[in-house]
A protein has these predicted regions:
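Acidic, amphipathic alpha-helical patches
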Residues: 51, 100, 169
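Conserved phosphate/ATP/ADP-binding segment of small-molecule kinases
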Residues: 80-83, 90-160
Length: 239
């Protein structure tokens, strides 16, 4: 009912018996820093997603954070999408790096956080790490930096986007998903040339993520309106 209320297409939804994906972590006083304590893949450990024919023509695709081999499996079922974004996390860097590198050869954009970028490239300098990631294949690299915003590296060089400042942070879990979802949703709405809209899309994603952090779970994001997001996305990027 919650998804339908927000107009989300559920035609590709699959249900399986078993435990849901479970992640347990610990945030420091500085919530930019978190430590993974436990990850239980649950039903997705042996899941092979099937893309309905009605969605196979999708032009804007987010390969959400899961095992790289599953992301690749989804990608192979799509018919020439215009823009493919892959999200990942430290777990896959540790246990499926080879599969991740194979996937990156076939996507347009990689999104990950700053600690994962440093881990992937074995490089402490974040600017250097961001730019060197292009050698894996993606034309665009986006590195999330929590309260410090995000870095985009692409054909036009670097772009640094601020995060929306918050007085109160309740739970940052899910902020990364909110960021990339808001960003890609903006791009899909605008259509046309990716380069013309990507920087503004990142601002849009940053604002979307800020609402996620202000509540636990989806309590805040489900009450957020498009008007709320647009009012805070007032930074207009000159391309």
């Amino acid at each position: 009912a919650l998804y339908e209320k927000h107009g989300i297409d559920l035609s590709g939804l699959e249900r399986s018996k078993g435990n849901t994906f479970h992640w347990e972590g610990e945030y420091e006083v500085n919530m930019n820093n978190r430590r993974t304590l436990e990850t239980d893949l649950g039903v997705i450990e042996h899941w092979m997603p099937s893309v309905p024919s009605s969605l196979a023509e999708s032009q804007y695709v987010l390969l959400a954070n899961c095992a790289p081999q599953l992301q690749h499996h989804v990608l192979k079922q799509l018919n020439s999408p215009q823009f493919v974004v892959a999200d990942t996390m430290d777990l896959w860097l540790n246990i499926a790096r080879q599969e991740l590198e194979a996937l990156l050869k076939e996507v347009d954009c990689l999104v990950l956080n700053d600690s994962e970028a440093r881990q992937l490239m074995e490089e402490d300098n974040l600017v250097v790490a961001t730019q060197e990631m292009h050698r894996f294949g993606p034309r665009y690299i986006i590195v999330k930096k929590g309260e410090h915003g995000a870095i985009l590296s692409g054909p036009k060089g670097l772009f640094v986007a601020p995060a929306f400042p918050l007085k109160t942070v309740i739970d940052p879990t899910g902020a990364g998903d909110s960021f990339v979802g808001g960003m890609l949703g903006y791009l899909a709405e605008k259509g046309g040339d990716i380069e013309s809209h990507l920087r503004q899309a990142i601002i849009h994603g940053s604002v979307t993520a800020s609402f996620c952090c202000e509540g636990f779970g989806v309590t805040t994001t489900t009450q957020t309106t498009r008007q709320d997001i647009d009012q805070l996305s007032l930074i207009h990027i000159s391309e």
